[in-house]
Amino acid sequence: MSDSEVEYDIAGSLNPGVDSEDDYSSGSESDSEIPDIIEDSEDETGPQQGEPGTMTFPNLELSDDDDDDDDDDEGRKKKKKKTDDSVESYFGAPQTGKKSSGSFAGLGLSQLVLKNIARKGFKQPTPIQRKTIPLVLEGKDVVGMARTGSGKTAAFVLPMLEKLKVHSAKVGARAVILSPSRELALQTLKVVKDFSAGTDLRLAMLVGGDSLEEQFKMMMSNPDIIIATPGRFLHLKVEMELSLASVEYICFDEADRLFELGFGEQMNELLASLPSNRQTLLFSATLPKTLVEFAKAGLHDPILVRLDAETKLPEHLEMTFFAVKENQRDACLAFILKEVIQMPFATPEQLKELERLDERAIDDGERDEDRKQKRPKFKKERLPPAHQLPSEKSTIVFCPTKHHVEYVIVLLQTLGYAVSYIYGTLDQHARKNQLYRFRTGKTSILVVTDVAARGIDVPVLANVINYSLPPSPKVFIHRVGRTARAGNRGWAYSIIKDNDIPYLLDLEVFLGRKLLTPRLFKQQNPDPSAEPDYVNTLTIGAPPRQALEIHGEELAQMVKDSYELQQLSEVAVKGERMYNKTKGSASQESAKRSKQIMALGWDDHHLMFGEDGESAKDALLARLGQKRIRETVFEFRKSKTTSGAEMMATRRAQLAPIQRRAAEKRAIQEKERLAGLVHSQDAEIARSTEEDMATEADLTGFTTEEDLRAAKKAQKSKKRSFRDSENFMSHYAPTNDDKGYAVGNFAGAASNATFDLINDGSEMQQKQGMKWDKKKGKFINAGSEGGKKFIRGEGGQRIAASFRSGRFDKWKAAHKVGNLKVGALEESGPATKRVLSAREFKHNKNEAPKRADKYRDDFHKQKTKVAAAKEDGRIQKPQPKSELKSTADVRKSRILAEKRKQKNARPSRGGRGGGRGGRGGGRGGR
């Protein structure tokens, strides 16, 4: 068995006394379709085994007592009854001796779902799955909060399949899963297909960029589950006049992104159309601590399942920060890749393979333009398993804007690395190709933006590099949370400048981890052999100065020699200028503390690189500089009696006591801080780790797991709090952790969103401010259009929410079908069967291209196509005309000759002169 195939004996786990090797053997069917990572939790015990005598799984066998007593009539009746109810029991939960949340069988899932889980090779549920699946099966509205890669997708897909079971003959979708991006929707579709194998459930994926006619056909096939992006789903809802009254189960995947800028209008339209008795789930890697504003989503008595407060970052993640100057960031990136990570350069074989893939991508693009050409099939390489690294040094580089992405990829390719890239406005086909190269190990570096990285399926990584520090702590967690998964170790390197220090201090407070400079570490640990803790502290320092200078000179020469790099560098600088204007500001307290951190040697030699050889030289220069008395320009080479010298002496006499008192105050504050006698920011950091979980006042309107468990045991009503949920104002300020998770109303989400990923370009930026309305004669909000409801289509354009183009009406008339009647039974007439079974006509003819016209713009391109067609034999050289006549040609020529004879033998009408007519009858007629 290969490493990519995992075998798990569920029958043996449920009943250790029965050998289940004959039942089935689970293995990974396709490693190319990897769902959202379902990690094995290391801190959980294995699945608890059932008591002897329980039935095996998945074959419905009798217990040991029934098998031994074959003559017992009662046993035969039981066996007959079980045989009759085999279908129902197969879709029901297995009868285990004791329910255990340590295994999927103990969560109440049916045997068919368990079989599909085992076939994919998953053994134990993750914490988010253990806590949410039983609640969802009970019909509760759940808000799930867990970091990226914790198995959130399976947490809502498995109970959905358990509830739907089989296809419904009634018209109307019963489950809807909304995703913020096409990539995430495709990933969710793969998971649903894997776990629904063996059922007759119908799926439909509705995303932008696909054919509307094909999606009309999908919706007319009465799907049970719809996986869609909000833009296209609302487009089809308006165009087809869909009714969502049949929806029983709706899930908002990556809910914080769905309810932010891009999909706010679409979500409000969709939520108003959903029935009130639906079950609503919200899942995301980052959700706010207070979820009162999400009441607009229609949650009824929701239960909050939050795991990120327990471990905000992966357990084995090591982090460090490199302090650089303004013009040293590129040199630091090259230094990290070459010296720290030791990234190998691209081999000649890799470069040839990448060139071949580029040529194939160009050919595919030309075939898309010329749809008559048939696309050749290439054998795709299988993706590695979820627990295996794409390559040994696989690294993601996060950039702030797409302009930085374009600059960095050219820079790294010039250095000799194999690089892939993805940003928000990249074409969907190009995204797939770039991600496929990175997943298969053909490239070792993936350069992305935050907007593009959300929803990208990269299970395991070795390193993460932040080209610039993100302004939000949660964006930082989302970035670095992609490494050190599934018990693996990983590194996160961040490049920061002096203006990033306030954001770094906000991150320090949010994570509850102490910022450690080289100077502070040496004061706390006099032992020179001591190593810093990169897991529990935020270690900062500067890379070796000499190495940075070498890489900086090399890159400067590269940029000087390349016109493309010069242009991209200028565009990236302008893009960063706009990015800094739009990103949020750090807290005032962090801005004040940043000066203290800079005074503590934040840019000293980094502890990772051992002793600093430059420090001794700097100390010597400092001592030499102190040998002479420092003089100002007013005193240099002037006598003491001049006015300037007297003024400086008076000023020094006045400032000396003030400077002395300030130095004494700083020394006292430092002693108090070390003694723990003051409530400083450090005390807030220490206290924030104890206040991660939400209090009762913070989670007003939400039920926690502990409350639900206590209510089931005691069967008593919970004592009502004296605090009014609407008017109560707390007497203490929220902690920094609360501020990080806080969210305002949706009207102000553009500026106060808790996890607002700044767009990597200006294409999706909304207008801000006021503009003059000529008709109204006053200023109005630039983002409003007179109160009309608009939606943003998949192309980015704003259209009216009630707009119908009539394409569905034309499609219905062409296929002779009617509207969907939600709630009615499916039609099985000939018209419906014809529509569902009809195949889309595709041009398969490989005709010769037209002759190239030198006056057209595509002359050279068409000339190349004609030359290729001649080589393929589609265009043949003209042959000489045959002189042999066929029987039909001979007969035709004889008939024509006979007609000429008859015409020439007619008598003339004229007189003399041969019938030339007129007077005289010819030449001599006079």
UniProtKB/Swiss-Prot annotation:
Q: Locate the Helicase ATP-binding domain: which residues?
A: 133-305
| Bias type Basic and acidic residues, positions | 362-372, 837-861, 868-899
Motif Q motif per UniProt: ranges: 102-130
GO cellular component, as recorded:
nucleolus; preribosome, large subunit precursor
Q: Which top-level enzyme class is recorded in the Swiss-Prot or TrEMBL entry?
A: hydrolase
Q: Tell whether Protein transport is among the UniProt keywords.
A: no
Region span, Disordered: 1-102, 362-387, 709-731, 835-926
- The signal peptide stretch is none
The domain of life for this entry's organism is Eukaryota
User: Residue ranges under compositional bias (Acidic residues)?
Assistant: 19-45, 62-73
Q: Which UniProt keywords apply?
A: ATP-binding, Helicase, Hydrolase, Nucleotide-binding, Nucleus, Ribosome biogenesis, RNA-binding, rRNA processing
Domain Helicase C-terminal residues, every copy: 370-529
Q: Which PROSITE patterns match?
A: HELICASE_ATP_BIND_1, HELICASE_CTER, Q_MOTIF
General function of this protein: ATP-binding RNA helicase involved in the biogenesis of 60S ribosomal subunits and is required for the normal formation of 25S and 5.8S rRNAs.
Under the heading PANTHER family, the entry gives: ATP-DEPENDENT RNA HELICASE RHLE-RELATED, RNA HELICASE
- How is this protein named in the record? ATP-dependent RNA helicase DBP10
